[in-house]
Amino acid sequence: MNSMLFSSLTIAGAICGYLIGGGFASGQELLQYFASYGLKGLGAVAVSFLIMVFCVVNFLTVGKKENIQNAHDAFTYYCGKKAGSFFEFIAFTYLIVQVIVFFTGAGATIAQGFDVSPFVGSAIMGVLVIITVMLGLRKLIDIVGSLGVLLVVMVIGITGTFLLKNPSAIIEGSEQVATMSNILQPSKNWAVSGFLYMTFNLLGLAAFMPLLGQKSESQSENVFGGVLGCVAFCGTIVLVMLAFLTDIGNVGTKLVPNLYLAQQLHPTLASFFSIVILLGIYTGCALMYWNFCSRVVPENSKYYKPFVIILGVFGIIFGSILPFDVAINIIYQIYGYLGTLFLFFVIAKFFMKKKSGK
């Protein structure tokens, strides 16, 4: 029993760790996809939860049942060879696109936290990531990546503390946000927003979750761990969203809303939180950039380092031009709609298996 509980908690932690990175910690995506709708955002969270729990549990259990060994196997299982290759390619392109978003997020975080130009932050993050990927400093990424737990704890602690300061302001904030036009939204409809929030994450989850499920000891662990991870993740979204609503007039003007909350609690806390966010961005960014570059050009090729440098410079340029909120709004919407197409395949496969009794 204890072994099953530990394994389930490990699965739940992996789910949250995958989804809660530097981008989530900034709060910008949660502002757009949930808080911008006021208390209707709770409905958006519910929509996200339903899609998430269905897909995550399905991915985990299929991974074990079908002995999925890699992302190619997963996409082929759900979509067939041709469509599977297409979605695998889309998931692959998401790596480099997300790197650009991370560069933009680093620029916004440093600009808001230390009052410098966003280009400085994007450039510093870009150079660090390029050097890391060129030199193969995988161990450094693993060490910094262990701070992911601290990032999650700080987000929960900061937003929870801020929420407790004035919980009665939630209703007022919900009414106020309806009159604000400066906050970008993925859709005018809260339900569509909740739907897109999970579908833009879907291709990445489909590439990762089946492999996680394949390594578990039992399907019970997969189901319990999957549901627990979804509850924890969506519960964190609710906490952050409600905290935003208590001061939406100011939060809605910030590119890094969670950092603003930390600044209101204590300047030292805000400075430390800025660094933790940047380390979270660095970890996710370096891993994604490494995976992308090494799949395009082999690491032992003489073209590998020039490719890493040139592509990284382009990433820095795009990352410093695009405002963080605009980057999230446009890019995540595009991948949300692509993820919606993939969701149809997942649902169709589920019912086909049910019908055949397999």
Q: Predicted regions: what is each one?
A:
Residues 177-183, 244-267:
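Membrane-interface interhelical connector segments
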Residues 2-4, 36-42, 65-94, 112-118, ...:
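Transmembrane-helix boundary/entry motifs in multi-pass membrane transporters
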Residues 6-25, 44, 91-95, 99, ...:
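Hydrophobic, membrane-embedded alpha-helices of multi-pass small-molecule transporters
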Residues 22, 92, 96, 129, ...:
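Hydrophobic alpha-helical segments and their helix-loop junctions in multi-pass secondary transporters
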Residues 106-108, 117-125, 132-165, 328-346:
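Membrane-interface loop-to-helix entry segments
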Residues 5-9, 33-60, 224-238, 333-344:
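Extracellular loop-to-transmembrane helix junctions
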Residues 72-78, 102-122, 213-234, 287-310:
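Helix-loop-helix connectors at the membrane interface of multi-pass transporters/channels
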Residues 45-56, 99, 150-162, 224-249, ...:
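Selective recognition of specific alpha-helical transmembrane segments in multi-pass small-molecule
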